[in-house]
Amino acid sequence: MSQANAHEQALALSAAMLAIDDVILLATTGQCPERDLSALLPSLLRQNQARLEDYFLEIAPFEKGRALLVNFLINGVSSEHVRYLIQVTVLEEKLSANRALFAQLLQRLNEAESAAEHFPLLHDAMIARFADIYQASVSPAMRKILIHGNPDYLKQPQIAARVRVCLLCAVRAVGLWRAYGGSKWQVIFFRKRFLKALRALRF
């Protein structure tokens, strides 16, 4: 686990944890910061970037995700955030192993990139498109992730769509984490080094 990889892995998991925090906020309050989505959404359409930071609009919002990870690593107490992160990690792994579904995902993201030439990423049309991509090309890779929250919010189509979009962003961030050599074993066996990398992040 090189120092460079530790930095990239820490940043990618911070992004994933922020997306998961937004899932929880949407499910329990019906809203999440627009800035979070603005930062995360470009990663769905960007490929082969020179730096991990270049996949995102900005990384400043990821500080909250970093704080959640640091708290978990220090206190060792599981939380709803960690449970969702584990499920998203398994989902990303199964998705990557399913060649047909993964190919479908890439095709639909390419189509979304074309649509993004006409609409801002936060436009309702793009949110609906990304939500549909998650539902059709990601979620089927494993048993559905059960979202706990206020049913009055979760039954609203616009909020449910944003929950799916945040899950899609979390899956993408986990995929980037793996691309930079991330694995659950490294988090377990190099816990102190990973914690150091998280604390060294500058936003």
UniProtKB/Swiss-Prot annotation:
It is a peripheral membrane protein. Coiled coil: none annotated. The keyword Membrane applies. It comes from the Bacteria. It comes from Dichelobacter nodosus (strain VCS1703A). The keyword Cell membrane applies. InterPro entries: HflD, HflD-like_sf. This is High frequency lysogenization protein HflD homolog.
